[in-house]
UniProtKB/Swiss-Prot annotation:
Record keywords: Ribonucleoprotein, Ribosomal protein, RNA-binding, rRNA-binding
Name the record gives this protein: Small ribosomal subunit protein bS18
Keyword Cell membrane tagged: no
Organism in which the protein naturally occurs: Streptococcus pneumoniae serotype 19F (strain G54)
Taxonomic classification: Bacteria, Bacillati, Bacillota, Bacilli, Lactobacillales
An example Gene Ontology CC term for this record: cytosolic small ribosomal subunit
Functional summary from the UniProt entry: Binds as a heterodimer with protein bS6 to the central domain of the 16S rRNA, where it helps stabilize the platform of the 30S subunit.
Pfam families attached to this UniProt entry: Ribosomal_S18
UniProt record, GO biological process: translation
InterPro entries for the chain: Ribosomal_bS18, Ribosomal_bS18_CS, Ribosomal_bS18_sf
Amino acid sequence: MAQQRRGGFKRRKKVDYIAANKIEYVDYKDTELLSRFVSERGKILPRRVTGTSAKNQRKVTXAIKRARVMALMPFVNED
């Protein structure tokens, strides 16, 4: 349900990136894909921000956690 705001524009519906690109298996070694779902501080972004479905969010979360344990992605990204 896109509601009109005072500015006169509608909110754009977020698209599930994984479903749109027909990705069957979210590989923990694909850090380029996983970095789309992680904030600049290293935290996993919620569904409401990324627009992924619940099923794909669980896949992404499990892959990010696995990549962190294997030292492919940082737990915390401090600047």
